[in-house]
């Protein structure tokens, strides 16, 4: 006789992506999707209503942001296990999500079978890291890095600046005033010991966040 199914909640701001994951997950006999959310704010609200066993979520979303949403989800439903499914393939994003309380990290390039296995593994109390990410993390120092001192918003501004975006462009995308972005930039430079955007880009490349 089959055991109880794993109740899964999906969090992603793209409806088509959620639909694809729903079809994949519900094809597994031991799983069902009990809730969906398109933003961090929605996820925090929905998780209390559906009480999932596992939350499969992206971290790049509008609103409060993925890491803050992750923390609030675990505060509202501490019994839930969070599996991050992200487009980011670098160790730094994985490290930040695990530090925030995620039980696993998988990239969206992973095979369908890997997602199903990851859900089962974290549901059973284990952790799951994609092999490529695990190798990157193992190769990095276990001591705190300067990038770990950045807040979630500072980290987003840092990535944008290192990618070549201007303060005005970042202000528009993040719905912030240019002066607020300028304040973040000042704090980022102080924390990372960088003098200009070129040095920020170099730090990002060394961390695997940008390709040369």
Segments (PLM) and residue ranges:
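Active-site residues of response regulator receiver
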Residues: 12, 58, 86
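Short, conserved "switch-loop" micro-motifs in signal-transduction and mechanochemical regulators
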Residues: 88-89, 179
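Short, flexible helix-to-coil linker/hinge segments that flank and couple to helix-turn-helix
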Residues: 92-99, 103-156, 198, 209-211
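Short amphipathic alpha-helix used as the core "switch/output" element in two-component signaling
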Residues: 45, 67-79
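Short hydrophobic/Thr-rich beta-strand motif most characteristic of the beta2 strand and flanking loop
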Residues: 30-38, 46, 194
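Acidic catalytic/metal-coordinating carboxylates
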Residues: 39-42, 62-68, 89
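Active-site beta3 strand of CheY-like receiver
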Residues: 50-56
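Recognition helix of helix-turn-helix DNA-binding domains
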Residues: 166-199
């Amino acid at each position: 006789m089959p055991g109880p199914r794993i109740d899964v909640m999906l969090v992603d701001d793209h409806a088509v992506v959620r639909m694809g994951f729903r079809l994949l997950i519900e094809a597994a006999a031991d799983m069902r999707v009990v809730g969906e959310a398109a933003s961090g704010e929605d996820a925090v609200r929905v998780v209390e209503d559906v009480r999932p066993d596992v939350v499969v979520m992206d971290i790049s979303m509008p609103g409060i942001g993925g890491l803050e949403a992750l923390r609030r989800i675990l505060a509202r439903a501490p019994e839930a296990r969070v599996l991050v499914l992200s487009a980011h393939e670098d160790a730094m994003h994985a490290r930040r999500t695990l530090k925030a309380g995620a039980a696993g990290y998988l990239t969206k390039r992973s095979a369908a079978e890997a997602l199903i296995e990851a859900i089962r593994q974290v549901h059973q109390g284990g952790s799951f890291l994609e092999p490529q990410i695990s190798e990157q993390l193992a190769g990095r120092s276990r001591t705190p890095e300067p990038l770990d001192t950045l807040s979630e918003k500072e980290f987003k501004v840092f990535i944008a600046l290192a990618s070549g975006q201007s303060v005005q462009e970042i202000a528009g995308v993040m719905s912030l005033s240019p002066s607020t972005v300028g304040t973040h930039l000042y704090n980022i430079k102080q924390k990372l010991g960088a003098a200009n955007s070129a040095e920020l880009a170099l730090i990002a490349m060394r961390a695997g966040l940008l390709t040369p």
